[in-house]
């Protein structure tokens, strides 16, 4: 039951002590920019709606701008249904059933393989698990619910230091199949990028909007910040 779980994971006796409760991340409001058809956009100075042909994204990976700055409860499921269906319909319209599958170029394949090999064979001494935990604690402490300039800057400085440590991580498992160590290392690279985008964006946005609450800038500023942050 609950008492056994709390005892096992927190080392607490709930008949004598309260259960510790802290906020945690359960949704990412942001991601790859998309249109309402789930097509990925590559905005530029001349066309903010330019489509990246053949590439789609839905769910938390995507940012179709339907939630604003604070998603309401249960809307994530509705988002998946709506945009998942929209993506399928659009894919059916743009795919030529008579066209054969185009294979990626060898140069593109080589780049991916080289990246995997460089991470797997890196001669570092930094533990992936320890660096990930360090990053998680920094994000929890510096980029939490209530934010202000000093803690955001500290968090970004700490992440910048960790990004240097990322160059020295060690993957113990050297196998080519079912290599969870390598998967965790790749995940850490992605997590560091996401954490960096959150921290830099939060520090730059000198206002409060939706789930972004700045104690030093408590008011919404539509004149300067009614826009997305592109990272």
Go through each PLM region and give its residues.
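An anion/pyrophosphate-binding glycine-rich loop and adjacent beta-alpha core
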Residues: 1-25, 90-96, 132, 137
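Long, contiguous hydrophobic alpha-helical segments, chiefly transmembrane helices and signal peptides
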Residues: 2, 19-21, 32-34, 61, ...
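Glycine- and aromatic-enriched mobile tails/lids
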Residues: 27, 39-57, 61-231
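FAD/FMN-dependent oxidoreductases across multiple families
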Residues: 8-53
